[in-house]
Amino acid sequence: MINIIGAGFGRTGTLSLKLALEQLGYGPCHHMDEVLAHRETIAAWTSAAEGAPVDWDSLYGQYRSTVDWPGARFWRELADHYPSARVILTVRDPEKWYDSARSTLFQAISNRPARMSAEAMRVITMMNLVVWDGVFKGCFADKDHALQVFAEHNAAVQREISADRLLVFDVAQGWGPLCDFLGVPVPGEQFPRLNNREAYAAKHRERVVAAMSASGVQP
């Protein structure tokens, strides 16, 4: 059952939060990386983005927490379905968030190879429905629009989730606020800080090569 709902957009420190939650005993934690690793769930997330009813318990299975997209798209539904779950809104400087998302996530979708495997195209279709069309209405490239969506999303979460249930969290703050919120001891290890642009770009290149190879295309 889901105990922690991450409502923050991708590129707000969600991978660091995933690893931190798992270290604190709230794992496994769902993240877009989990969808890519378990692609049998792509159809269910696509259907959810199209408005079909969702069996959240079945979809999440053994996961105890969820962060990043696709889950963050459905924060309202998840907060209703799991009324005892706590909500964490990861935040980041809006300009830095946009520049990071544009140069990683959006670029990965925009600069894809002409030929890809059917499975890779299913991933892209899901991402478009959940994020680029579903959240940004196909206008992420319009910076002003994207920043407005980002601000309105963060405001809505803070308006609709009660203060005693919500943590607004910048991962730069480290363990302190997170552990206080969850009522757990601060670990002796450093707070995980991962998923910078360079690491993301290298990871994306690996995925592109894999998708092209699956299509019979020489990378």
Over which residues does each language-model region extend?
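Hydrophobic/aromatic-rich structural module bridging two neighboring secondary-structure elements via a short loop
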Residues: 54-77, 81-84
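PAPS-dependent sulfotransferase catalytic core
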Residues: 1-61
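Short active-site oxyanion
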Residues: 2-5, 62-65, 85-86, 163-167
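PAPS-dependent sulfotransferase catalytic domain
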Residues: 22, 26, 34, 49-60, 73, 77-168, ...
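The conserved 3'-phosphoadenosine-5'-phosphosulfate
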Residues: 34-43, 88-97, 115-117, 152-215
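Ligand-binding grooves and catalytic loops that recognize ribose/phosphate and carbohydrate rings
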Residues: 42-55, 102-119, 123, 135-136, ...
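Short His-Asn-centered micro-motif
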Residues: 6-8, 32, 67-71, 91-92, ...
